[in-house]
């Protein structure tokens, strides 16, 4: 049983990992595949814990589990490519999120300028060199220095919410009633300066 504080919050030492994961599932994320080449072999894994870190210098971050074999390959190679998945790439995400030993079987890809796989059909890619690695509990926090970026595509992203794949509504001119405020935010014409 969780210990509840006076304000209704659950005390940190009593947090159940399953409940924590369920609460984190309320935060909708994009889905990426982080790739590299390890001794001539393409390696990759599905990753939701990806974020922009800095514009000057251009840095991104992702958080692999400490037991990840794919992470070990990325650390050895010193390079990686973030492949942002498009809405129709659910099966690609499932493959790279599995324990399949040959995740690249049947997956088309090209080589990035630094040498990591760019998955065909990905919405965007960000080619990086490994900048630094920091401890993050049962995960590592890996910083990457951006070397090159893809062109912008008009397709919609694959999203993950409450343990399921989801997407953006195709017709944003008629938002669902609960999206009125979000719609106003997403369609604002002001410059994007959030970073």
UniProtKB/Swiss-Prot annotation:
A single MF term (Gene Ontology): FMN binding
Top-level class of the enzyme under EC nomenclature: oxidoreductase
Keyword Flavoprotein: yes
Protein's UniProt keywords contain Isomerase: no
Gene3D superfamilies attached to this UniProt entry: Electron Transport, Fmn-binding Protein, Chain A
GO BP term, example: steroid biosynthetic process
Catalytic activity: a reduced flavin + NAD(+) = an oxidized flavin + NADH + 2 H(+)
Main function: Catalyzes the reduction of free flavins (FMN or FAD) by NADH. Subsequently, the reduced flavins diffuse to the HsaA oxygenase subunit.
The protein's name in its UniProt record: Flavin-dependent monooxygenase, reductase subunit HsaB
Organism per entry: Rhodococcus jostii (strain RHA1)
């Amino acid at each position: 049983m969780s210990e509840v504080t006076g304000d209704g919050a659950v005390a940190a030492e009593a947090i159940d990992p399953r409940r924590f994961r369920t609460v984190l599932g309320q935060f909708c994320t994009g889905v990426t595949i982080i790739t590299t080449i390890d001794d001539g072999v393409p390696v990759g894994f599905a990753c939701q814990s990806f974020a922009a870190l800095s514009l000057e210098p251009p840095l991104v971050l992702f958080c692999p589990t400490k037991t990840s074999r794919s992470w070990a390959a990325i650390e050895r190679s010193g390079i990686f490519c973030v492949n942002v998945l498009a809405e129709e790439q659910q099966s690609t995400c499932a493959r790279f999120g599995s324990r399949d030993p040959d995740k690249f079987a049947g997956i088309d890809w090209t080589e990035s300028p630094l040498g990591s796989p760019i998955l065909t059909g990905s919405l965007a890619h960000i080619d990086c060199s490994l900048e630094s690695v920091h401890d993050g509990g049962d995960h590592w926090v890996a910083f990457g220095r951006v070397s090159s970026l893809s062109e912008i595509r008009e397709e919609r992203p694959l999203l993950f919410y409450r343990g399921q794949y989801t997407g953006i509504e195709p017709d944003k001119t008629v938002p669902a009633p609960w999206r009125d405020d979000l719609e106003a935010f997403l369609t604002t014409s002001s410059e994007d300066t959030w970073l």
